[in-house]
Amino acid sequence: MERLDALLRGEAPSHILPFLWMKGEDNETIREELVKIEECGIREICLESRPHPDFCGPGWWENLDFILPEARKRGMRVWILDDDKFPTGHANGGFIRNPEKKKVYLAERHMDICGPCRSGAVLVENFLQPDGKLLGILAVPKPDGQTLAVSGDGIMDLTDRYENGFVYFDLPPGPYRLFVLYTTQTGGGREDYMNLLDSDSVRVLIDEVHEKHYARYPEYFGNIIAGFFSDEPELGNVNGYPFDNTLGQKDRKLPWSGQLEAALREKWGDDFLADLPALWYESGEKTPGIRVTYMDEMTGLVRTCFSGQLGSWCEAHGVEYIGHIIEDDNAHTRMACSIGHYFREMEGQHMAGIDVVHHQIVPGFTEPVHQWIAGDRDGEFFHFGLAKLGSSAAHIQANK
């Protein structure tokens, strides 16, 4: 009854916060936009920062110096989209200035060798990317030449046999695959972007965007400034929008960080290097367990390093953290353009966000295949799964 009485008094709570596209317009134009929004009964907006030519520069601050008092006068709250480029993670160019903190990938190159071989040598230096850092070299038995599978047993660690660009070895009879495992910051997806698996990398975004806003407008935090919005942050280990990027795919770089390496070394112990090829290739009975462990540790770092860190910063400064990821066709459980685990990414956010765009939910198209703007996609997921992700997170996560 209290809600009904409030509605009858015209005291409806805010349930919508449209983007106010910031393109560097003059303040009078912005005032006109705010008036129109207010006339629609809307009391919250999200500043769409990315079209602005001077985000976190003098032009941006001039606009916010005008918007925030106007919002206060009109009883409106303001959210801020947290970056200068799509998707969230560019940190307003922060990784151009701090390249050592940008995204890192785990990569492999290999060649096949047939034993027996004594005093063998292979030039492997050129297997690495120009910036590649060698992680290890393995000789892995191949069970046959019919598939890409390798053996999970009998693996030889040749890392300490690497010298001056060559690896030297003796091999017993049989076919072997020589794996060169390395890390690199090039050749993957969005390279000048933050590493969601690295706390220091995510801190660059906070320093470049969040802290700068707080330093200028502390008196508006928690009242007029409601919080920050992240748009489709991604692991970004490969280019584009493959919704099916999982482990077990050849020639794919994988998300990586020093924190992830430390976690996997603790889990796998002496088998750390020997277990890595299973991330790309079938390696016997141990393959599923290795892949589950990698995904578990990796997405756990998404939670703690990325969403948890941003959410904690916002809470400490009296505001909230909201946004969404790419969920299309179950991509929320995968890598590339998404983050591997919807619920872990959402844990740091204060609302359970989803993205419904491009005619994804169309009445009647409830089966696994229907045509939408991106091709033949999963109508069953869009119809019955997508919204349920958000409602489930809202029920099970206490900060929602």
Regions found by a protein language model. Name each.
Residues M1-G10, H15, T29-C40, E44, ...:
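Mature extracytoplasmic enzyme cores
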Residues K23, E48-W61, M295-G300, E327-H332:
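Conserved short loop/turn motifs at secondary-structure junctions
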Residues S49-P51, T186-G189, A393-K400:
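Active-site clefts of carbohydrate-active enzymes
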Residues P87-E100, P233-W256, E315, V319-P363:
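Substrate-binding cleft/loops of secretory-pathway carbohydrate-active enzymes
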